[in-house]
Amino acid sequence: MTQTLYDKLMNAHVIRRDNSTELIYIDRQLIHEVTSPQAFEGLAIAGRKPWSTSANLAVPDHNVPTTNRSSGINGISDPISKLQIETLDKNCKTFGINEIPMNDIRQGIVHVVGPEQGFTLPGMSIVCGDSHTSTHGALGALAFGIGTSEVEHVLATGCLWQSKSKNFNIEVSGKLNKHVSAKDIALYIIGKIGTAGGTGHAIEFSGDTIQSLSIEGRMTLCNMAIEAGARVGMVAVDDKTIDYVKGRILAPSGAKWSKAVEYWHTLHSDKNAHFEKIAHFNAKDIKPQVTWGTSPEMVITIDGYIPNPANAKNHTEKVSWENALNYMQLTADIKISDIKIDKVFIGSCTNSRIEDLRIVASVLKDKKIANNIKLALVVPGSGLIKKQAEKEGLDKIFINSGFEWREAGCSMCLAMNADKLKVGERCISTSNRNFEGRQGQGSFTHLVSPAIAAASAITGHFSEVK
């Protein structure tokens, strides 16, 4: 019987089936400071120990400051942020969980650190108390976000009851246009299928365009699968996947490596495997994208115009557009390139890897950011990425252009740490969400690729790469 990649991974981890749900074994769990305190507290109250300490890896990321790290935790000004990181440290020590602490050079965003360390491996089932866990599917893994109570359940038992998703194949074919990246592909797809297009499905991205992407690019794509409504996003294993994993600290070696690679080569959908839903896109139709509203599906090309609600396809969409225009303080039918921006954020679990930073540096080299830009940040996804960028001299390009070069963390992706927008500020961001107040109360977020963020920083308004 032919199987999709998702079917293969689910079947490989099923312990028991019960009507419409399946009890599956969880190979790895990533933990951060926001969704874990109650889970550890539940273990303590019940007097339980973790099923497998080695199956878990913790790293603080949401609340960590991206400046003034020399004082450690005591340097965190916000008492709640400080408490959450202190609590993670304490819980990991109490329960024997391996943690990469705040000032360790390996620290970073959990969805960057997992693959970087080799903790994320093809064929594994991977969970985290974070919706963007779908990122890890780029390595041919079964990865999805879970809630706090489920974090506790995985800690205690190493298992989870899950309802099986339907299969959705999104195929992208052809050569990408110049300056078009995985982020543009993701936003373009979401613009076409909507934020509910993948609801109830596991999305497998396929086609020669996807195969041409680096692993970093595939991570960006799978990271955004959740924004299309899917819980799971994945790409089949190929030689790029195996080359990426090889030699990483926690990856297998020797005879175990050879055995693993043999299995990993089977992690692709079989020919003629059944998908409940299929969508095809041509790469030549994809241009650099930018969101204009309060949902990732509210997206246009960088040379496009703000949509007019009068042209909405139905009443629901019309009202949604009107509300978005009102919140974003935008006027229909104006060219988006005429809109000025206040701040620029390059980072997040979507676009903070070394490939992203190299692209940004190539656009910024020998240029300065516009005078109207109040703040421009480049925040690497991990301390190791920061180290590599500095080795290549990218940090000097960022700083010379007027950007601030920060420490690793989630930073301005969400208003949970010191890096946030003020009321009325408009930000062009390489992150993944643009709902009301995401980057700060009363702020306006526009999602773009790293290249477009850098180009727009130079001109002070939404711009293509020149």
Curated annotation (Swiss-Prot):
InterPro entries: 3-IsopropMal_deHydase_lsu, Acnase/IPM_dHydase_lsu_aba_1/3, Acoase/IPM_deHydtase_lsu_aba, Aconitase_4Fe-4S_BS, Aconitase_4Fe-4S_dom, IPM_dehydratase_rel_enz, IPMI_cat. Pathway: Amino-acid biosynthesis; L-leucine biosynthesis; L-leucine from 3-methyl-2-oxobutanoate: step 2/4. One of its GO terms (molecular function) is metal ion binding. This is 3-isopropylmalate dehydratase large subunit. CDD domains: IPMI. It comes from the Bacteria. Signal peptide: none annotated. It holds the Pfam family Aconitase. Keywords: 4Fe-4S, Amino-acid biosynthesis, Branched-chain amino acid biosynthesis, Iron, Iron-sulfur, Leucine biosynthesis, Lyase, Metal-binding. Its cofactor is [4Fe-4S] cluster. Catalyzes the isomerization between 2-isopropylmalate and 3-isopropylmalate, via the formation of 2-isopropylmaleate. Its EC number is 4.2.1.33. Belongs to the aconitase/IPM isomerase family. LeuC type 1 subfamily. [4Fe-4S] cluster binds at C349, C410, C413.
